[in-house]
Amino acid sequence: MKNTTKLLAAFALLLMTTGTTLAQTKTLRILMVGGGGSHDFARWYGQEDKKTIESTGKYSVTYTEQTDSIPAYLKTADLLILTNNQPINAAGQAAITKFVEKGHGLLLLHAAVWYNWEDWPAYNLNYVGGGSRSHEKLQEIKNLVVNPAHAITQGIPARFEFVDELYRHIPDPASKGIEVLVIGQSKETDAVYPGAFTVKHPKAKIAAITTGHDERSHQHEAYKQLLINAVNWIAN
């Protein structure tokens, strides 16, 4: 009887340990929405960034350029990444709003920090904290970490350079504000703009990275670490 009790206790402990391990290693589901003009979204986001994020072993990324499918995909997603500049219909806008207002995380990459949607001003006000309407020509820019204490900048060099579009990103004073983590500096004019930042929101974690035009950023180690850190920060 004593042996049976010990066996049952050991089995129960095994089940508890297994359950805890499974909970700790749960793969989080990410929806990444790309598509639009001026960029090879499928190659550099749907393939390269997806590979970078999934290399952590913690995430499963579904990439789509079908914006009509956003409401369906968000029903099972844990985190949303937007990197598109193509239209999003009213149903998609409503689904994204509901998703974020319920406290789910949002990561905005490159094209998604633009003023893309005139019919959805609340997007830039509430989720971007401003936006970009122009950029410098494609050329080498300096990226400078200005908040080295933040989780998103851990392991990132204090300065790193690559060829990209320097977005002239302007914060909106009517928004709840952003916290700038990395700035991009023009080698041509010395002008500086937010390169990576978090957006203040009462319910959700939101972060943004403004660079990401082509392989020169997506395959750069600093960019890849910044991307992974941003996803980790939002997910946790």
PLM region spans:
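Extracellular ligand-binding/catalytic regions of CAZymes and related secreted enzymes
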Residues: Q24-L28, E54-S55, A72-K75, E188-A191, ...
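Residues at alpha-helix caps and immediate loop-helix transition turns in enzyme cores, especially N-
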Residues: A42-Y45, G92, D119, Y193, ...
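Bacterial Sec-dependent N-terminal signal peptides
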Residues: M1-T25
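Short, solvent-exposed loop/turn segments at secondary-structure junctions
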Residues: G37-S38, P87, V113-W114, S186-E188, ...
